[in-house]
Regions:
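Formylglycine-dependent sulfatase
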Residues: 2, 11-479, 483, 492-556
Length: 556
């Protein structure tokens, strides 16, 4: 059952009601796949290591001024592809990424999402992606993208006087209205999709009709600004892929230098295209490790992280700059050797920990003690409330529920993130986040974690074979009549279900079911006032048939 502190945390997160006020008997088994499948409780957990009280505490840095924010996001990089996590077992090192954790914190239980678009949407909006509809990987020509009713992290920071720039992959929509510069960023220079979509026009059998390319093909690498200017700098060809991250790096460094000269606090969001398939390396990066294309690409990627850290040092602003390194989703394993590595079960696009658990390292001078290891649950949705709190805005989540103005625009939304600042500073013993919900790219609730307990009520075991050559991307999820239960402390890699004693172990823990239903019901309750902005996209004919039956127009 739930201890009182966890009940209070859950209640404060969702609404003003106490968890005990939920009429558990009114939560009927079988009335909703979201509720009926949930079987979990928040048993108290003593974390092994906490973020310690810093030597020079302040609301957001050592100087008391607004902290700069350097946010670096990799692409499809596995938990074990960063040497701070693998301790060298992969045969190569990532010293610059590791440095962020050494001078700050390494997080073991940080959650992205199950795919590129979803993971980036969770960070940018502070909402679980099912609310925005951005759960499915965005494709060229698709209608769905980041909408005008959802505030972005850039909107939040613009409200506090920041200069905002994004460089590299976006993947939150194909159209002009989806570009970062329509959502709070002063400038953007980057690509809009995953790499394998960018190179499709180079296939010899790609349609030659220019109208097809115009309607369904990838746009080029875009340079845009908040004043409405949009420039297509040309296609992202396989040759350009060899050096495109260097282009983005130059743009990011130029942005930081300009804002430093202007004496403005800055938020730089750098999105590497490494290590999404298909990897194309310049000659100088090939063979660096002797271990293959992925390790070589990681070493190149780590070097670019090092260049950004070096610039921050040279400008003398390291003590007032938050540095974050993370990635969007779990490793894509089935494309190995051009694919990532994770010790967790599953991979990108699955319901398992391997699909959602991501590396995350944060350096925050004056807030996070160097060398910290954090085992508490945290997620990409938590960045917006935390960055707001770093600027003295501690009630953003509640204010946006009632309606609030950010960057000259009025929003009324339900943020799903938590303010982690009190925990990171050492003022709170535990992370505010006690739970995480696992949504599929189709918008189904696949599982729930509270404290160390996890339930999986959908599962996927698809391997690459002649019937499903694209592995997990083609295989269906199986809905379970009775959920599977895991203790992610005793069994973090979800292998307990292979034990001959697993059935007995689960049978002794059926007391967890009803409290879990209460949590899910309370979460779903928020959708009454804050319904999803859009339905998740589909790769199948179902979406087309639904549009035909409802008379929904297609893309013009």
């Amino acid at each position: 059952m739930f201890d009182r502190e966890q009940e209070k945390a859950m209640s404060a997160r969702n609404d003003e009601e106490e968890l005990d006020n939920v009429n558990r008997r009114s939560v009927l088994l079988g009335t909703s796949s979201l509720v009926a499948a949930a079987a979990l409780t928040s048993s108290a957990l003593a974390q092994t290591q906490k973020a310690a009280t810093p030597s020079a505490a302040s609301s957001g840095g050592t100087t008391g001024s607004k902290p700069n924010i350097l946010f670096i996001m990799g692409d499809d990089i596995g938990w074990y592809n960063v040497s701070a996590y693998n301790m060298g077992i992969m045969g190569y090192r990532t010293p610059n990424i590791d440095r962020i954790g050494r001078e700050g914190a390494v997080f073991t239980d940080w959650y992205g999402q199950q795919s590129c678009t979803a993971g980036r949407a969770a960070f940018i909006t502070g909402q679980t992606p099912v609310r925005t509809g951005l759960t499915k990987v965005g494709l060229p020509g698709a209608e769905l993208g980041l909408g005008p009713l959802d505030p972005s992290v850039a909107d939040v920071l613009k409200n506090h006087g920041y200069a905002t720039g994004q460089f590299g992959k976006n993947h939150l929509g194909d159209r002009d209205e989806h570009l970062p510069t329509a959502h709070g960023f002063d400038e953007f220079f980057g690509n809009l999709y995953h790499l394998n979509a960018e190179e499709e026009p180079e296939n010899p059998d790609y349609p030659k009709d220019p109208e097809f390319r115009k309607r369904f093909g990838p746009r080029g690498v875009i340079k845009s600004s908040a004043d409405g200017k949009i420039e297509n700098t040309g296609p992202l060809t396989t040759r350009r892929m060899e050096t495109i991250d260097a282009e983005f790096l130059d743009g990011a460094k130029d942005f930081i230098n300009r804002q430093h000269r202007a004496n403005k606090p800055w938020f730089c969001y750098f999105n590497s295209t490494r290590m999404h398939i298909f990897t194309h390396l310049k000659a100088a990066s090939q063979g660096k490790t002797g271990l293959g294309i992925y390790p070589d690409g990681m070493v190149e990627h780590d070097g670019m992280v090092g260049e950004l850290l070096k610039l921050v040092d040279e400008l003398g602003v390291a003590n007032n700059t938050i540095v974050v390194y993370t990635t969007d989703n779990g490793a894509e394993v089935f494309t190995w050797p051009d694919g990532g590595t994770t010790p967790f079960k599953g991979e990108k696009a699955t319901n398992w920990e391997g699909g959602f658990r991501v590396p995350c390292l944060i350096k925050w001078p004056g807030v996070i003690k160097p060398g910290t290891v954090v085992n508490d649950i945290c997620a990409h949705e938590d960045f917006i409330p935390t960055f707001a709190a770093a600027n003295g805005d501690t009630d953003l989540v509640e204010r946006l529920k009632k309606g609030s103005t950010l960057n000259g625009k009025t929003f009324k939304v339900h943020l799903d993130g938590y303010n982690l600042l009190p925990f990171l500073k050492g003022d709170a013993k535990e992370s505010s986040r006690k739970e995480f919900l696992y949504w599929s790219d189709d918008g189904d609730l696949m599982g729930l974690r509270v404290s160390q307990w996890k339930v999986a009520f959908m599962e996927q075991h698809t391997e690459v074979n002649p019937k499903t050559p694209l592995g997990v991307w083609q295989g269906n999820f199986t809905k379970l009549r009775a959920p599977m239960l895991y203790d992610l402390r005793a069994d973090p890699f979800e292998r307990g279900s292979t034990s001959m004693y697993y059935g007995d172990w689960v049978a002794r823990r059926l007391f967890l079911i009803v409290p879990a239903q209460a949590i899910v019901a309370k979460y779903i309750e928020s959708f009454k006032e804050f319904p999803p902005r859009a339905k998740a996209a589909s790769f199948t004919i179902n979406d087309v048939m639904e549009k035909i039956s409802t008379g929904s127009p297609g893309k013009n």
